């Protein structure tokens, strides 16, 4: 009988699944996806006027080709997100791109047109140092791979190993450079810090060591990043101690030659490590005799070393970035500098945005007061500036600086030099520039969106007419006649807006669909009828804030925080929504530095992206916890409480009205702190003088298990039904404790027989342990969702070697203790806890539950899979009350018979083929429709859509036949009128009889 009911259920479910799928005409109608590659690490641009792509490798372990005309991704390969997938080096030769990844363990060759893999080989173990192309007889044939102890030569066409040789004295010498220029030999250069340089020359054909030279360099610590090889194998190294350049011809010389810089009227910057920046356009030819010498953070010099003579071609005392590029026989140098005034790296920008902090990647550039830069080309042979090669561009965000410059040079029809420039800024913005007076910026890409750390959705404001109509209520001072006239004028304004909307619809209906432009303008943003269109406020790891319109993905505003350091943590809070007109909405961003522990507050308008006039408090101590209270000030802004490391409380805003409310509500304000290293959870309460008092403490032995996650409930969550009606018509009441915390622990012992996952349900007010359970032979990573009266968490079962879900549900029983008010201090009995586990056939990347405005709609779990798909799983499938043997009462409740396997159906994927690479999180928000939940999945890509867990029961479908129903209604009305007339005639005739 049970099997029969189970088969019936699965047949019923299978038939209903396609109804939740996306139809062909709905693709892209209410969803969108934006793909990114991340911060550029290496870039190679094709040098031809008709080139249509540029190949990049990024810090997100992505190799991709971008369309140079539009900036769109032509193809993309996403490697592992760990250090194993990191790209260590990249070289471009013809139509092939060579990459080395995984710390020098894997080398690949890619075809640049379609992104196909030509070949892949596994390299010998060892610390990777350098990669170079080796030419022979006017053609590039080999790839040289330099490691800590070996030098290997591989065939460019197949990747097969030609030879590998061990480097002499590799245990003490740090080999860091490899060089070849088609002469049949290849050099490996190593250094013993502050001692000497070792130069080993190998024969390309058989790998035999031809020559080995040792040169004393007591001032040199590193070769890479400081020295360079110029002209015909001449090693040039800057010597800050003697203020000179040291040169060594690798072919003929055995000792360094010193060339003082004073003879060229040049000087190194104090405390700055100078660098030599050479260029070798073709691996079969020698390097150019010209090179850049980086003297200070904003000082470059173009020098030439030829036949033992060093000469200054051009001095660039105020320069941001430089780059070389070659086309045909012409090699040019691109120089980026400020257009007018210059601001040093250590200066400050706008005080409201904080002061600059030095970043390792941006310390070698300067910033401009007006954020306007120019790029000019110079002929390297003479240092003469080429005419009509100036590109002037401006950066929108104050405080950001250019970090990298790549040049794409080509020859025009008149044999003059043309070029395009790829610029990457400090905030991970990619700009592709061209020489056009009308449109300098050909395209731009906001690659910081590849690393979103937190986001919130904010309702859009009402239109002016709607706001004026709302403002009528609650104002009786105008009198009856005044209110009537105001209502009349408001209705006329609404009628005018409706008429213009109808005219626009009629006008657009006459156009082809491709010509209809629905441009999103920040000045005309207004809430739609069902509140489906919202403002998405996103914060990225680089410290950049974005305002994105949710229905189209259009970036409406952006702000950059220049003093945010890497690995900082962020928390975004909405203090005031758009519901309190005329007060503007207000968001507060809390940024915490990981190293110092210090925090900063930034207050801004989430709709327009402007910094607020409200000055946030200056935080002088590290912040441990932040609380957004339901208490509001006189301007309807929620109060933010900040607790520092001395357990002192700071309120924002701290008006007299707020302090009075906090004084009254202090006994009912509780918070908790987590110290994962010590395994301590502490509960505190607020006193009336805004000090804190320890109310409870719980210690989990850190030598046995460590705290990995603490999950509370969403404060904006609504629960519609407080109980479940059972088969016998009794009610099983839910335990809806808003103060409940789900604490997940993991064993410190990594042995698969002794690992375990622990779950503790703790009351955050009293510290009472409501429930605890242990999953033996299990390990993380653990993903958890805590909502209403249930907790779902996922883990890896080491014994059965599979992923599993465990669901917990809490009930008070058939009698509700207090239906009007909840208090953690007045709960005599522990709730009943039901638990059940399920097998899931895949690991997961992220998990979240749907949420709606009133909580009436059924809940679904949105599960992000490693493949990039998002699975919408009904919570009813993870019900701990599912019976193994169905009974009459369970069938009455529509409980599904228990089956341990949770299957993945492709029809349940809400993003069909719009996969999200390397998904890190899923955000859900309610809309104005109870049936609709807004979903944003973010990772390397961003995907936004809508889901309907209980179908669209509150709105007509898109394919609703308005013409048919209208014609039927008109027909019925017409038939009623005719029937009425016929009945009157019949009655009249009957009366005359």
UniProtKB/Swiss-Prot annotation:
Is Transmembrane helix among the key words of this record? yes
Q: What is the effect of changing residue 471 to R?
A: In CAVIPMR; uncertain significance
Residues carrying a glycan: 370, 818, 913
Q: What's the reported outcome of changing residue 144 to T?
A: Found in patients with retinitis pigmentosa; uncertain significance
Which segments does the topology annotation call Cytoplasmic?
Answer: 984-993
Any one GO CC term of this protein is:
membrane
Q: Which cysteines form disulfides?
A: 227-237, 338-368
Q: Where is the signal peptide?
A: 1-22
Tell me the keywords, alphabetical order.
Answer: Disease variant, Disulfide bond, Endoplasmic reticulum, Glycoprotein, Membrane, Neurodegeneration, Signal, Transmembrane, Transmembrane helix
Instruction: Name where it's found.
Output: Endoplasmic reticulum membrane
Disease implicated: Cerebellar atrophy, visual impairment, and psychomotor retardation: An autosomal recessive, neurodegenerative disorder characterized by developmental delay, intellectual disability, hypotonia, scoliosis, cerebellar atrophy, and variable dysmorphic features.
Family per record: Belongs to the EMC1 family.
What name appears for this protein in its UniProt entry? ER membrane protein complex subunit 1
Give the species this sequence originates from.
Homo sapiens (Human)
Question: Gene name?
Answer: EMC1
């Amino acid at each position: 009988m049970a099997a029969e009911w189970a088969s019936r259920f699965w047949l019923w479910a299978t038939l209903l699944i396609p109804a939740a799928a996306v139809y062909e005409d709905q693709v892209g109608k209410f969803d969108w996806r934006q793909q990114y590659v991340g911060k550029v690490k290496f870039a190679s641009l094709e040098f031809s006027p008709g080139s249509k792509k540029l190949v990049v490798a990024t810090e997100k372990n992505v190799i991709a080709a971008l369309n140079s005309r539009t900036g769109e991704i032509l193809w993309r390969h996403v490697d592992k997100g760990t250090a194993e997938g990191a790209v260590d080096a990249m070289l471009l030769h013809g139509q092939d791109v060579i990459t080395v990844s995984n710390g020098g363990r894997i080398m690949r060759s890619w075809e640049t047109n379609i992104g196909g893999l030509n070949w892949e080989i596994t390299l010998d173990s060892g610390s990777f140092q350098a990669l170079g192309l080796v030419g022979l007889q006017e053609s590039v044939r080999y790839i040289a791979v330099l490691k800590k102890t070996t030098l290997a030569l591989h065939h460019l066409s197949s990747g097969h190993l030609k030879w590998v040789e061990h480097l002499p004295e590799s245990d003490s010498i740090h080999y860091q450079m490899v060089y070849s220029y088609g002469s049949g030999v290849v050099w490996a250069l190593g250094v013993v810090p502050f001692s000497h340089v070792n130069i080993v020359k190998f024969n390309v054909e058989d790998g035999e060591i031809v020559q080995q030279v040792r040169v004393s360099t007591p001032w040199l610590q590193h070769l890479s990043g400081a020295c360079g090889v110029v002209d015909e194998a001449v090693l040039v190294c800057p010597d800050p101690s003697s203020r000179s350049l040291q040169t060594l011809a690798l072919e003929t010389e055995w000792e360094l030659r010193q060339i003082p810089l004073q003879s060229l009227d040049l000087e190194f910057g104090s405390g700055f490590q100078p660098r030599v920046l050479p260029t070798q356009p073709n691996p079969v030819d020698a390097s150019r005799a010209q090179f850049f010498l980086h003297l200070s953070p904003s000082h470059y010099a173009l020098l030439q070393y030829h036949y033992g003579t060093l000469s200054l071609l051009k001095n660039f005392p105020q320069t941001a970035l430089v780059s070389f590029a070659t086309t045909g026989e012409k090699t040019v140098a691109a120089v980026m500098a400020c257009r007018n005034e210059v601001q040093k790296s250590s200066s400050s920008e706008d005080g409201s945005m904080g002061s600059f902090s030095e970043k390792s990647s941006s310390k070698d550039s300067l910033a401009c007061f007006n954020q306007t830069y120019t790029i000019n080309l110079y002929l390297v042979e003479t240092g003469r500036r080429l005419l009509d090669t100036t590109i002037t561009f401006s950066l929108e965000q104050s405080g950001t600086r250019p970090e990298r410059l790549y040049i794409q040079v080509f020859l025009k029809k008149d044999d003059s030099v043309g070029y395009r420039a790829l610029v990457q800024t400090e905030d991970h913005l990619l700009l592709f520039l061209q020489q056009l007076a009308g449109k300098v910026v050909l395209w731009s890409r906001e690659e910081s969106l590849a690393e979103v750390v937190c986001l919130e959705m904010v309702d859009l404001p009402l239109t002016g007419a709607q706001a004026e109509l709302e403002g009528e209520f609650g104002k009786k001072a105008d009198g009856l006649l005044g209110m009537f006239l105001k209502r009349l004028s408001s209705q006329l304004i609404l009628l005018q807006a409706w008429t213009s909307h109808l005219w626009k619809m009629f006008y657009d209906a006459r156009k082809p669909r491709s010509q209809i432009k629905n441009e999103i303008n920040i000045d005309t943003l207004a809430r739609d009828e069902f509140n489906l269109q919202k403002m998405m406020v996103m914060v990225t790891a680089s410290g950049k804030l974005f305002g994105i319109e949710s229905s189209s993905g259009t970036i409406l505003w952006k702000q950059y925080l220049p003093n945010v350091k890497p690995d900082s943590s962020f928390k975004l809070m909405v203090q005031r929504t758009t519901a309190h007109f005329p007060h503007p909405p207000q968001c507060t961003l809390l940024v915490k530095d990981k190293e110092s522990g210090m925090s900063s507050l930034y207050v801004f308008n989430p709709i327009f992206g402007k910094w607020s006039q409200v000055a946030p408090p200056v935080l002088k101590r590290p912040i441990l916890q932040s609380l957004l209270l339901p208490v509001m000030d006189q301007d309807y802004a929620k109060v933010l409480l900040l607790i520092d490391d001395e357990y002192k409380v700071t309120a924002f805003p701290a008006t007299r009205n707020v302090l009075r409310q906090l004084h009254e509500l202090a006994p009912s304000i509780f918070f908790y702190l987590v110290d994962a290293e010590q395994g301590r959870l502490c509960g505190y309460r607020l006193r009336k003088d805004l000090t804190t008092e320890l109310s409870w403490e719980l210690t989990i032995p850190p030598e046995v298990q460590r705290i990995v996650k603490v999950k509370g409930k969403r404060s904006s969550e609504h629960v519609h039904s407080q109980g479940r009606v059972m088969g016998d018509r009794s009610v099983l009441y839910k335990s809806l404790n808003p103060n409940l915390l789900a604490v997940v622990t993991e064993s410190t012992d990594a042995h698969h027989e002794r690992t375990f996952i622990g779950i503790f349900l703790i009351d955050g007010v009293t510290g009472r342990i409501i429930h605890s359970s242990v999953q033996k032979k299990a390990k993380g990573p653990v993903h958890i969702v805590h909502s209403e009266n249930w907790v779902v968490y996922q883990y890896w079962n080491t014994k059965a070697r599979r992923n599993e879900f465990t669901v917990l549900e809490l009930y008070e029983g058939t009698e509700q203790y207090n239906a009007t008010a909840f208090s953690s201090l007045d709960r005599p009995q522990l709730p009943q806890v039901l638990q059940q586990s399920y097998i899931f056939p895949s690991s997961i990347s992220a998990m979240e539950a749907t949420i709606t405005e009133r909580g009436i709609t059924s809940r679904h779990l949105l599960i992000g899979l490693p493949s990039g798909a998002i699975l919408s799983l009904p919570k009813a499938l993870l019900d701990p009350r599912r019976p193994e043997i169905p009974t009459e009462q369970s069938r009455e409740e529509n409980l599904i018979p228990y089956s341990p396997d949770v299957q993945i159906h492709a029809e349940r994927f809400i993003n069909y083929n719009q996969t999200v690479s390397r998904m890190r999180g899923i955000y859900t928000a309610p809309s104005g429709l109870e049936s609709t939940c807004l979903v944003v999945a973010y990772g390397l890509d961003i995907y936004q859509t809508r889901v309907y867990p209980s179908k669209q029961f509150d709105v007509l479908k898109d394919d609703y036949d308005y013409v048919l129903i209208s014609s039927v209604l008109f027909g019925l009305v017409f038939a009623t009128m005719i029937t009425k007339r016929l009945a009157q005639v019949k009655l009249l005739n009957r009366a005359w009889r």
